[in-house]
């Protein structure tokens, strides 16, 4: 029998996995972010309110995240490769089914349930597999993969507006169904990797496969609570930034430009944040607090911008606020997944990723419909963005208790080498980076 490697290769095929995760993220969250541009067309076609149509994107987000632990459990049992490939097929079928919808219920089932279930099977296994391939450059690799969100939004926002103008919402969804089928070959690139911290046998029970025992660890529980609160406002701009720009007096392509500006800032910030986190200059929990708070302030700023005088106006204040939001939200995203190996160990990172996505789904299910409800009551999205920013700022405040919850931040040091397959805190080298020269002392990035 071939012995297991001592640790992640920190490169090699890992960069191919990073490229696959990049595409998976772009075809999931990038597409979900751009779908908000189609909501006004759906509301007009079906003669329904903004709150009713917001449930289309909200259900897709909620199902994708709520079912992420199922994707993680299936990946733990059968491997990430087949799970992601099946998820790509389900996502494509959901979009194609939605193109022939005769009512909002059909869209709820097609985009919300079927496509959302497919997205649930692709994201957590892909990102969890990527985390297993890297150690010293883990957050940078995760940040690189998560730039797929911004890069995809940059391309899909104007492309989707063009498709809506040219083919209508039915033709646009049909073509997007063909595009998302590319998730299947991306899954084929996720080569399995055996590590020394892996359990000798797959979990025997469904509860063990879901990794619910991780909530017994105080650090993970604090992190999960803060992340769930942030999810209540984090995804509202994904769904309603485009419609908010339209309400502010900008035309269709002006609204697409606002989404694209946020996407560019998001993509650039994810790489920069990943590089910064891997340097070890600032502990990861403190970075979470800083960039989480800035994200909340960015959403607040978008809710306070004045309206544009004419439809031809470009809305410089909203563009600036969207850029600031994109930079802060993009900086926050890789830290959420980069900190997980330090909280639960490399053996539990796939399960923890799924659980975090499930918790964020609680906010993802609440935020967009609440935003649509407030828009129907007030006439615009200003109040919606103000309320959702309070969720993000509250979650960032919860993160401030994270260092105290980590065993390595208490006066008594933890054991030097706890078994990672039991979901315990990894030794410091697993969550830190060597000095800039590649050698020398290792800096603790946890506290």
From Swiss-Prot:
SUPFAM superfamilies noted in UniProt: MFS general substrate transporter (SSF103473)
One Pfam family here: MFS_1
Localization per record: Endoplasmic reticulum membrane; Cell membrane
Catalytic reactions of this protein: pyruvate(out) + H(+)(out) = pyruvate(in) + H(+)(in)
Entry keyword annotation includes DNA-binding: no
Family assignment from sequence similarity: Belongs to the major facilitator superfamily. Monocarboxylate porter (TC 2.A.1.13) family.
Protein name, per record: Monocarboxylate transporter 11
Species for this entry: Mus musculus
